[in-house]
């Protein structure tokens, strides 16, 4: 009986942790932007300078279900579109992200624009701007672990306009990017006696390159660093292989918090589908069955005289 009671206490504590993550006090901060394991194929969600980087019209959808089996766990759905404009100096894109964690949810829609300049025969540096709005809702009073007046914890339909910037340099085999997708630190909600919550500015640094191991196998190491004031640095390290320009497979390590693997299949020049599985190495890992992330992407090439090469990133 005591072990059951202890399990319930741990469960309640974890749910309270979700509540705190959903409505963060202004005096503290933590990672708020959605995590992506397949970040190297979903770059536009956090870096507007990525728009049009493959010189095709790209449509990508991704669904991430974190901590499966844990009630109220985060889940994220993302839809991304982007393409270069005629002349290929300018590119436009857009993204819609629906993010749910515990009793809080936010749906955001952003437009992206990138200006691209050549830095070599096959390399470009892009400067990007992102602008849009998020709709935030939360009902922390629905959690039995929070014993306060419900009126203090309800946020219904809070609009959060924001904008961001990004830099992205790439060649056929290398890339590096820096971005801050939301520069405004919007106040989400406040109550003099309970909580004052806000958004926090996040910075993303990414990089990677591709090495030919032999004629059938390529190796691509990559990384992502996420930084926000007052929170531990989040670092993803990835090692992926591409077999015969068809199948991606590899592993991921998230510094001090998780590990996993991913795979992707290239059906043809246009269609790709990918899957990633993460395991949490922190204490909350004992209460969930891992994280699943599924991605599908389709490229349209309006330049019929050009063949689409394999997408490395």
Each language-model region and where it sits:
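Bacterial N-terminal signal peptides that target proteins for export
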Residues: 1-15
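Subset of outer-membrane beta-barrel
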Residues: 31-313
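Short hydrophobic "helix-edge" motifs at membrane interfaces and signal-peptide entry regions
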Residues: 14-17, 171-173
């Amino acid at each position: 009986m005591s072990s059951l009671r202890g399990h319930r206490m741990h469960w309640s504590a974890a749910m309270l942790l979700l509540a705190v993550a959903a409505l963060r006090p202004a005096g503290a901060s933590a990672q708020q932007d959605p995590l992506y394991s397949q970040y190297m194929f979903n770059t536009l969600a956090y870096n507007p300078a990525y728009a049009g980087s493959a010189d095709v019209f790209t449509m990508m959808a991704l669904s991430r279900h974190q901590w499966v089996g844990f009630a109220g766990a985060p889940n994220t759905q993302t839809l991304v579109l982007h393409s270069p404009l005629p002349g290929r100096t300018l590119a436009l894109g857009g993204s819609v992200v629906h993010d749910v964690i515990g009793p809080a949810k936010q749906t955001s829609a952003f437009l992206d624009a990138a200006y691209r300049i050549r830095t070599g025969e096959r390399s470009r540096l892009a400067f990007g701007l992102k602008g849009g709005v998020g709709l935030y809702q939360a009902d922390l009073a629905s959690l039995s672990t929070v014993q306060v007046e419900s009126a203090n914890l309800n946020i219904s339909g809070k609009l959060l306009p924001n904008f961001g910037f990004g830099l992205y340099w790439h060649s056929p085999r290398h890339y590096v990017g820096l971005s801050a997708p939301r520069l405004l630190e919007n106040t989400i909600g406040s109550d003099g006696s309970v909580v004052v919550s806000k958004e926090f500015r996040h910075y993303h640094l990414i990089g990677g390159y591709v090495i030919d191991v032999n004629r059938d196998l390529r190796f691509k190491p990559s990384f992502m660093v996420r930084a926000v004031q007052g929170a531990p640095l989040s670092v993803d390290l990835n090692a992926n292989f591409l077999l015969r320009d068809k199948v991606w497979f590899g592993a991921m390590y998230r510094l001090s918090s998780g590990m996993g693997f991913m795979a992707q299949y290239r059906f043809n020049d246009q269609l790709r589908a990918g899957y990633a599985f993460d395991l949490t190495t922190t204490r909350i890992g004992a209460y969930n069955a891992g994280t699943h992330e599924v991605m599908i992407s389709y490229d349209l090439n309006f330049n019929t005289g050009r063949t689409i090469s394999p997408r490395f990133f």
